[in-house]
UniProtKB/Swiss-Prot annotation:
Residue intervals of every Phorbol-ester/DAG-type zinc finger in the record: 697-744
UniProt domain LIM zinc-binding: residue ranges: 17-81, 76-135
Keyword Metal-binding annotated: yes
A GO CC annotation given for this chain: cell tip
Protein name: Probable Rho-type GTPase-activating protein 3
Source organism per UniProt: Schizosaccharomyces pombe (strain 972 / ATCC 24843)
Record InterPro entries: C1-like_sf (IPR046349), PE/DAG-bd (IPR002219), Rho-type_GAP (IPR051854), Rho_GTPase_activation_prot (IPR008936), RhoGAP_dom (IPR000198), Znf_LIM (IPR001781)
Amino acid sequence: MIFRKSISKSPSSKGSTVCFRCGQAFQRRETPISFGGHMWHKDCFCCTKCDKGLEHSDQMLVQTSDGRPVCSSCAHTCTACRMRIKDYALMSGYDSYHRECFRCHDCRKQIIDSNFKRDNRTIFCNDCKQVRHPSRSSDESADYHNFEVDVTIKPTETKSSVESNKSLSIEIMSPQKPPLSPFGGSRDRLVSETPTNMSQAEGGNVPNDGQDSNLASNSADSLLPSAKNRSFSSFTSFESPMKYDDSFFPISPSISPLQKVNKQQQIESPTATFPLSKNTWKNRFHTFHKQSFTPVNDSSSSDSLKPTINEEALDDFAGSASPYKTMSLTDRAEPIVMNGHMRSLHNATSPFRPFSPSYRSSDTHSPRTRSPNVQTHKKTSSQPSDLSSFAQLLSPPQVLSPKPNGGGHKSFRHSHSLSETSQQTLVPSLGSNGEYHLPTNDHSSTPAQSERDSDVEELREQLENLTALTKKLSERLSSSTFDNSKFIRTEDKDTVRSAKLEICEKFFSFADVTDDPTLKDPKHQDLVAAANAYMAMLRESYGTEINNLLERRNELLDDYNNVQKILNESLEASVHLNTKNLELADLNNNLVKQIQHRVPPENQSNLEHTITTSSKNTTSSINPLTAVSSNSGQSSGRPGPLSPNLNVTTRIDIKGKKGSMHLQPRDVNRKVPFKSMHTKSKSADPVVGNEDRTQCDHVFHVNAIFKPSRCYICSESVWGSELRCFHCSISCHSRCLKRLFAESEHEKTMSETVSENSKWMPEMPTRMPPPGPSPTMFGRSLENQLKIEGSVLPQVIAMCVSCVDAHGLEVEGIYRISGSASQVRVLVDEFENGSIRMEHLTSDLFACTSVLKTYLHRLPEPVIPGTQYEELLEAEKIEKEEEKIERVVEVMKTLHPAHLSVFRFLIAHLGRVCKHAEKNLMNSKNVSTVFAPTLMRDKVNRFDLQHATKKSTALQFMLDNVDKILHNL
């Protein structure tokens, strides 16, 4: 069966779509497969390397640079080791390699960079390539790696027309490897025969087997000789043909072991006839193994040539790209089975599919492939063509040159060169016998010269374009009327400025406008005058409104400033009032203590008739939290911790020092009204009237206290969930309840004497006095605290100040906003117990500052005692600032060392707080208002607003000059 198909009129030229592989048009109801920008038959859509049928829905397909599909198995399989590639792959052409498998064929050295050489599909490093194939002269390269191909060219006659031109039709016969004979053994002889008459193949139509019998075997028009003139072609790339059994045996080239395949692998390819036109497929990257040219006779035409091409032969030029079935040139050089007088191929289907080789440079190769455009070979042209198109079709590895011997046909040498960079142009010449002959190849022109010539042509074109562009710019510059002489000195700014002004004057020139006759028209002038009058009216009306709005805005700004001042004053007043409230509370406590201690011992008998004992049995010690039966028969309970569900019943014998506690359930009626025995007293503090002093069985229960009240034991404010007596409604802290039953504390709460000279005092209710100074940290003098701790600063001051320095300098309202009372009590207890941690202080900065102020407030002697305080008030009368600073320093140096160290530490810390007043809003005035009452006290502990203002002023002066004071201290 002869695989010859004429596509002189390509289906694409008729407007139909053809398959990218077989070149055949699609049937009417056939659905093509679109992939890689091309259309495919379902049967033709196969892997380029392994020829395995593919599904278009497969998402793992890989597309080559020319749009051919490759299955995932071939794309991810190493060509060298045949193992699957799981990570990155190095691509060279259509071959994939592991990183460690990408090695030189000779030295087995791993190739890391992209500089390597490639011969066919064999990889060489640069060193091995130079050693293996050193550069040769032009004379040596002419005789190096050649084989003979019988070529005879004659013009053919076709139908003439007005636009007809002479063209040349060349038939290229590709020898392929037929299947082995049944008896085994391969025949390496290549015999090429062509029919003697091709007149019946008009339009490229190939006769069938029946038509072959009508062909004359020895016609005068035969292009190829008969059997006696058969020529043999050696397809070796590196060796010359050698004789074997009276014939030439093609010696296999030195190929990679990966390219060696079994002789059983067969490959077949159809023949093809190519038109030599200017638009014909010009691909310099395909390789031909043998070319034979056959004229096509057409008796109906004598003026023009009709180009024909066998498209199916195009797919066979590059051989197979399968990594598993790689064919060498020698393996393909098998004899062709003769069918009559026409060369025919076996009917077996080729298991291989052609591929488009990658673009390769003669110097370096890159693993990234790039294939040229191979779509133009399907186009036909009726324009005159020459052999230069066919010369471009013959890739650089195979250059045709005429054989010096003569004969009925021309024999050419086919030189297979390793370099793939040169491309020879062949121009046909018409001989005396009417035959076309290829010109002799000039061995003096090397591939490098051809490349240089092409580069020179490109550079000439670029030079012409640049010359034209320069000329165009020169014309534009000469046509410009702008005077650029002023810009000769670019550094002269005055010149540039004057040039700009000149341009603006020219641009805004109204000389031509004034000469316009339209402006002199009376109607136009009236319209302009009316428009100007209207604009003036608008300016006047809107100007008045704008002025009113501006005045309103200024008034609002003034109001805003006034509100800001009032707000600042209110903040200062609130801080001052809070300080005054603390001072008033201290003054109230002091007054109560003074009144209670003024009762003389000799008048103790006068007080006995008002105080009666609640029990005749006295004991020297008191057992707190003892379950005793109540005389009233309410309830009794076991001793245990105080809880909201239990009431604590306490009987107190003030004189007999006896007390008892009863636990009662909460179902006791708590709606007994609180009755104050002093009707004029506005205080909510619990009092004990003269009538009820005889006996009170205190029954404490947990109650929510929201009205201002004082603790019965410590006289401090009570708020929130605390204890309240069910009978007399006195309040008590839960922490102070244990002091009620301590004997030492019980003795301190009893008054033994009453002053004789107290008749002039107003009648006040009698209350239990608060306990004396606590022997704990809060309430201990600085001298004793430093001796106990053995440090320069008390622990409370050091930790609180460090916490504020680290986290609170930019907190708004620091030291002004008080912390939660419950959190403050928790922190105070932790300081007392020694379990305080810095993390506890940083969790609530306001509670931390409140603890510091509480510690300073409870000091028996303030940081600045009364003596130094009086001297500071005298220093405030000094007008000169320097003298005042010196006086303040002198007064501070008279402090006790413990007080002086605390003062230096605190005044430096408060100075740092004032420096961040923009963010924390605590300037020197606000800070002095908060800390002056706690740092300074007079001797008599008097309270008035005048002294409070003097304290704040003195401390503010020290804060404003803190650096100078600390430098001199």
